[in-house]
Structure formats: structure tokens, C-alpha cells
Amino acid sequence: QLMEWVVHELKPWIDSTYRTKKSRSYTGIAGSSMGGLMALYTILHHNDTFSMAGCFSSFLYPVMEDLKKELHACSLKESRIFLSWGTDEFRSKTALAYGTDRNLYITQQLLQKGADVFPYQHIKGKHNEASWEKELPIALPFLFEE
């Protein structure tokens, strides 16, 4: 429901209130943690509206099985997706290995669907705004590359 509101109410309001380039090719969504997961779901389900997604430290663990089904069922037009995770977000090296595996699995599935994906493992990156701020100079040029 939230993403329906974003697509059908918030984006039209932004486009009517501000001078924007309204087309899909200029429209992206980004978020961190649960917001990163929502950005990923949004580009999967509203790919006719969004061509870019920045998914910073997406909260993947509890929804991975459902996400696998979503990835299998989706079709993507030309899309750019930035996926990041920090090495210091995890409590152990085993957890880091699982987190890295999940992000690379998603990367592989998105690539098979035709998306351009930038998987970024932030060395010493934490699950906080300070780390995500450092990732923006990497993510934005990729997402808005012409």
C-alpha cells in the first residue's frame, strides 16, 4: 500500500509541485535498511515508473524466500540498481558471508532480468547514515549515468 501511495499520489504531487523531468528514465527511488528493501520492491513492482533504485544496506534476512519469488516473477525494463552492504553491519564473519551471499544472489537475479546492477561491499561500512552518506558519491554517478 505504501508504494501504491508513492507511485499514485506522492510522485504526481512532486511532479506537479516542482520542476522535474517526469519520465521513467529520470525517476528513481532510494532507501536504507527497510527503506532499501522498499526501494528494491518498488523497482520490481513499479518498473514502469522507476528506472533506478538505490538500495543501501537493505534489510533482506526475514524476506529472502519471498524476495526470491518476486525476483523470479518480475520483468525489468532498462533499470539501474545500486545494492550496498557494509562489512561491519554483521556480528560475525559467518553472518557477513551470508549477507554477502544474499546481496550477490539478488545481483545475479537482477542481471539475468536485464538490469544494470552495481553491488558494493563497503569495507568497514556500518548500518548507519554516516556510512550510507559515504556511499552516495559512488551510487549517484552510477544511477544517473547516461
Please place each PLM-identified region on the residue numbering.
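Non-catalytic cap/lid and distal C-terminal segments of serine-dependent acyl enzymes
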Residues: 1-146
